[in-house]
Amino acid sequence: MMKRTVLSLLSATLMLGSVASHANSPAYVDSKEYKVLVDPTRFASNPSSAAATLLTNLSARLSTLGFDKTITGNFAAGDRDTLAYYDTPGTCPLNKRGYSVRTRAGDDTDIQFKFRHADEELSYWTDVSGAGKNKETKLETDVTPGNLVLAHSTKQDATTTPTTVAALIKLFPGASALSDVSTSSLSKVAGVTVTQQEYDGPVSDIGESVAEFTLTLWYIDGAATPALAELSFRVGADADKYFTTPVLTRSQTLNAAIGSIGNGWNIANDGGKTSWLYAYRSSSYPNGFCN
């Protein structure tokens, strides 16, 4: 009888421990990415040195916010790729309906079809399926200053670049929601090609998950200096698809810090890289890519 009582108490304790560590509901999303645009002119002459200064200033800001963890590691040059986004000039039906298409070549080579919306369930249930090889689909929370959306995307091997919406639907059957504009042509957004240089390395152990930091620089049409700089950190769900309360709380502190680094780093922005590119006024589209 005593043995049975002890075993029952032990089982109850283990169950309570499990509930305590996973008090939140399982998440729809695979990860959360927090991002902010910073002043690109700071990276014009020596990006590596500027990245180190940025990290030092960020750590100082976290200290003033009472962050109870630390950032370890340093930024080092990582993947370098050539990107292009595609939509229909003027009408921009993909962007207006929450979709985007991006090709990538270089250290990573693929094509991605993405749907973004503030409603988690709508984003989750929107079809973004692909028909290519090595498909990878994910649902991620994208957080920028003043905005939060759920991004549902599929990337796959890039075999061709779609020149019409109909061609896009063949690559990604999930794009059939755009069948009413299937004859529309697709061109590079803003008429430009982007060279993307990433710097990664810094991490912060925030509990059951790790925050991984990335600095991304965009160079337009082979320019020598970057036109865009983004600081971001990604937090993946734990092995059981949970984000614990301590992880979420510390993520919010990190988010507050990247949005208020100080020392002239932050610039007024609200939409992230893709929105920035759609608003970019190039020589090909001096009045803007979309009407």
What are the language-model segments listed below?
Residues S18-A20:
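N-terminal signal peptide c-region/cleavage motif recognized by signal peptidases
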Residues N24-N291:
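Phosphate-end processing signature that detects enzymes handling 5′-triphosphorylated RNA
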Residues M1-L9:
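Bacterial N-terminal signal peptides that target proteins for export
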Residues L10-S11, M15:
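Hydrophobic alpha-helical targeting segments used for export or membrane insertion
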